């Protein structure tokens, strides 16, 4: 569920957020909030991890720097995943693409950590290969079919 879009628009009501926090997050294998969503979920990584989901990937794509840092927490163990920022406006749907790729790698039999790292690599390559493709107006999609 997307709570807050990349453009900063809140897409889920406060009541919807509270329902998600209390009822859905404890059932999830992993949650993948972006930084604005993480700020809604809690004031610290520890607070977010206390919501009942064993794995959290906080996505740092909103950072305004050359190297973007995502934070992956698996059963309390924290790792940073760093990727070079690609200069493109074709970033529409990157969060959904990343979470779908994680699910696909899990379905292929990879463990959680390997699935997250493989999905991160896939997304980075999809963004890079689609950086200069012009599709319509505004933020375009990544290139899902780069291989």
Describe each region flagged by the PLM.
Residues 78-92:
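Short pre-catalytic strand/loop immediately N-terminal to key active-site residues, enriched for Gly-Thr
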Residues 78-80, 105-119:
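Phosphate-handling active-site elements
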Residues 33, 49-50, 98-100, 107, ...:
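Internal alpha/beta core interface subdomains
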Residues 13-78:
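Conserved phosphate/ATP/ADP-binding segment of small-molecule kinases
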Residues 1-3:
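A short, structured active-site edge motif that brings together acidic residues
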Residues 5-7:
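Conserved beta-loop-beta/alpha segment of the NTase-like Rossmann-fold superfamily
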Residues 88-112:
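Short, small-residue alpha-helix embedded
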Residues 113-147:
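Charged C-terminal helix
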